[in-house]
Curated annotation (Swiss-Prot):
Structural subunit of tRNA-specific adenosine deaminase, which deaminates adenosine-34 (the first, also called wobble position of the anticodon) to inosine in many tRNAs. Inosine-34 allows the decoding of 3 different nucleotides at the third position of mRNA codons, as inosine is able to pair with U, C, and A. GO terms for biological process: tRNA modification; tRNA wobble adenosine to inosine editing. Keywords: Cytoplasm, Nucleus, Peroxisome, tRNA processing. GO terms for cellular component: cytoplasm; nucleus; peroxisome; tRNA-specific adenosine-34 deaminase complex. SUPFAM superfamilies: Cytidine deaminase-like. Zn(2+) binds at H216, C254, C257, C322. Its main location: cytoplasm. It comes from the Eukaryota. Residues 162-283 form the CMP/dCMP-type deaminase domain. This is tRNA-specific adenosine deaminase subunit TAD3. Belongs to the cytidine and deoxycytidylate deaminase family. ADAT3 subfamily.
């Protein structure tokens, strides 16, 4: 984890902009709507707290797939003079017997405690201190460490020169296609970070005769990656077609292409031109799906829009799905 002051990238944390060019695309509409999860909690005598905290540190905190670092683990019950402690998420352990076995392992003899799995807590911290205080009262006491998105921005690893090179590649081809009179000057560049020289550059297939309406540049690119796998070009094949790929687009993708990128498990998408009527990444585009960061889906990917004017693209009708 790099400290903000040591980050080589210039980041505007308030507006989510990196190096004055990459605008972070996230579903900020839902970020302050708590996604509640069930956790295991235990009510104990304060004298037993040391052993329980040791169990949390040595087991639950290390192995729980859900980070609960934004929670205060302990809250006091003044009326009963007991402590209520959050142990772990039910995603980590769903069986009550397993929890009891772990608790029994830290005590000699029989101990009385109340175990519960009906406590609901926010899975993620809110973006403001005011909401943090409100959720602490309504759900469970939280720790305020600042806006969580600041850390997300700070953790991005981005080679700006590589981004420029690939966007320039896509832009040049798109302009060339438009100059040649092609109706769909959309371009996608698929880059496997582990094989950067062996990239896939895909033009929109709808410019060709006998094409299908779904032959968008993204779909053509994914298909090309699949063909390489089938032909044995990529020997280290994964179960997902484009696992951890970086994808560079001339135009904001439509819902079909955005979902195809979800299914392909790409890592990052960078696009040049937003499509206000048909796009599916920005909250202000299309129906506001924000497909890359939608809580209803089981996967996400990073998304950015290049907000500089260095890389022109071929223009398309605003109702065209890209």
């Amino acid at each position: 984890m790099v400290k903000k002051v040591n980050n080589p990238l210039k980041i505007d944390y308030q507006n989510g902009i990196i190096e004055n060019r990459l605008l972070q695309i996230r579903n900020f509409k839902d970020v302050n709507t708590p996604k509640l999860i069930n956790v295991w909690s235990i009510r104990i005598d304060p004298r037993d707290s040391k052993k329980v905290i040791e169990l949390i540190r040595n087991d639950f905190q290390k192995n729980d797939p859900v980070s609960l670092r934004h929670l205060k683990r302990i809250r006091k019950d003044i009326e009963t003079s007991t402590l209520e402690v959050v142990l772990c998420s039910k995603e980590y352990i769903c069986d009550e017997g397993e929890i009891n076995n772990k608790l029994k392992s830290i005590w000699v003899g029989t101990k009385k405690y109340e175990l519960s799995d009906d406590i609901e807590v926010p899975e993620f911290a809110p973006s403001t201190k005011e909401l943090n205080n409100a959720w602490s009262v309504k759900y469970w006491p939280l720790i305020w460490n600042g806006n969580p998105n600041d850390q997300i921005l700070n953790d991005y690893k981005i080679d700006m020169q590589e981004v420029r090179n690939e966007l320039s590649r896509a832009s040049t081809l798109s302009v060339k296609m438009a100059t040649a009179g092609k109706q769909f000057p959309m371009v996608s560049v698929f880059v496997d970070p582990s094989r950067k020289k062996d990239k896939v550059v895909a033009e929109d297939g709808r410019n060709c005769e006998n094409s299908l309406p779904i032959d968008h540049s993204v779909m053509v690119g994914i298909r090309a990656v699949g063909e390489r796998l089938r032909e044995g070009v990529d020997e280290d094949a994964n179960s997902y077609l484009c696992l951890d790929y970086d994808v560079y687009l001339t135009h904001e993708p439509c819902s079909m292409c955005s979902m195809a990128l979800i299914h392909s498990r790409v890592r990052r998408v960078v696009f040049l031109t937003e499509m206000q009527r048909t796009g599916s990444l920005k909250l202000t585009s299309g129906d506001g799906y924000c497909m890359n960061d939608n809580k209803q889906l089981n996967s996400t990917y990073e998304a950015f829009q290049w907000i500089g004017e260095e890389y022109p693209v071929g223009q398309v009708d605003r109702d065209v799905c890209c």
